[in-house]
């Protein structure tokens, strides 16, 4: 039976939500009611599949961890007042912590003046952020296109590469096995997981996938393309595969890919949506090898965990294809004043507090601890790996990985799996995580594995 629109119901629902937004705390009855509402509305109006996905953060089927507020720079608080150490970081958006006061203040100050731009007059913060990124990024990267997400930044990169290379008769892209570049149609064509790709086949033509980290396979793809006249327009890579399971390539791999691109006249697109903004111990992961891409994709942490923003930064030679018609690729909300204010403040915090260096030091501490645990529990843990504050613990199978996430939740530490590798649990905390909290995370991981070991022995 068709449901008629109800203005009265919509008004009541929005008013109820606004009342909740105004509240700082909830009493016990309000908390229980909110939990029930959120679960019901997710089931009936968002997507019931998300409830199954979040089964590791529920007890007794009540999905008690309904997110309510940030506890501190490094923690989250649910509606029951339980505080969790955040080792997920919103999949890498909270590099400067939760509600970083510098970022929040910048956004609030801009909100008091002009939240969104007119679209016709020149907006100053977009210009200032573009200038800042030109100074911050490696090599000849100079011009920025701003959008709202990592997927959008990849879409822009692919379109830029097409616009630049099509007149040169080059139409083919090389991506890698295990890659994740987003789920819009263009980005999905570069993404490598069949689960995400198959329902939307056929995707964009002209994408080849080669094994990640295998420079011989990459070289062969270039050579074969040259022989057949199907020449390569661009290579798109993550310096470290995030959703693939935090997979690090062999040292020198990016350097060799850069050489191949130069030899065959292809563009190098680096997707640093997850590895960028200090996450791996450098501002950008490509700096570990001093590699300079032609196009760089950023998002996630660029907005400081306060505003969504993505950026596609390119050299003048590549970006100039948009000079004659700047409306070839645009987006209404991309580069809006609030998002740019957040990004500028985020960059300021990263540099002022030298957070990339902190990520390297704290990451070493955590990774050493996880590797020790892997040695102690070889029947549960297959590997521990990472760079900076982008780490992963790979378990012997998917179910063991899920049990670890569930046990860590009981220890009040938030972790989750990677999208392309279910048995791998990512450890991706804010770069502001204190040494004391690092030690607490390792203690919790030890407790979780010990509990899992007892269960195994009882069986």
Swiss-Prot record:
It catalyses: an alkane-alpha,omega-diamine + 2-oxoglutarate = an omega-aminoaldehyde + L-glutamate; putrescine + 2-oxoglutarate = 1-pyrroline + L-glutamate + H2O; cadaverine + 2-oxoglutarate = 5-aminopentanal + L-glutamate. PANTHER family: AMINOTRANSFERASE CLASS III, PUTRESCINE AMINOTRANSFERASE. Pyridoxal 5'-phosphate binds at residues 150-151, 274, 332. It is an enzyme of class 2 (transferase). Coiled coil: none annotated. This is Putrescine aminotransferase. It comes from Salmonella typhimurium (strain LT2 / SGSC1412 / ATCC 700720). The lineage of its organism: Bacteria, Pseudomonadati, Pseudomonadota, Gammaproteobacteria, Enterobacterales. Its EC number is 2.6.1.82, 2.6.1.29. It comes from the Bacteria. Its cofactor is pyridoxal 5'-phosphate. InterPro entries: Aminotrans_3 (IPR005814), Aminotrans_3_PPA_site (IPR049704), Class-III_PLP-dep_AT (IPR050103), Putrescine_aminotransferase (IPR017747), PyrdxlP-dep_Trfase (IPR015424), PyrdxlP-dep_Trfase_major (IPR015421), PyrdxlP-dep_Trfase_small (IPR015422). GO terms for molecular function: diamine transaminase activity; identical protein binding; putrescine--2-oxoglutarate transaminase activity; pyridoxal phosphate binding. Belongs to the class-III pyridoxal-phosphate-dependent aminotransferase family. Putrescine aminotransferase subfamily. Catalyzes the aminotransferase reaction from putrescine to 2-oxoglutarate, leading to glutamate and 4-aminobutanal, which spontaneously cyclizes to form 1-pyrroline. This is the first step in one of two pathways for putrescine degradation, where putrescine is converted into 4-aminobutanoate (gamma-aminobutyrate or GABA) via 4-aminobutanal. Also functions as a cadaverine transaminase in a a L-lysine degradation pathway to succinate that proceeds via cadaverine, glutarate and L-2-hydroxyglutarate. The modification N6-(pyridoxal phosphate)lysine is found at residue 300. Keywords: Aminotransferase, Pyridoxal phosphate, Transferase. Pathway: Amine and polyamine degradation; putrescine degradation; 4-aminobutanal from putrescine (transaminase route): step 1/1. One of its GO terms (biological process) is putrescine catabolic process.
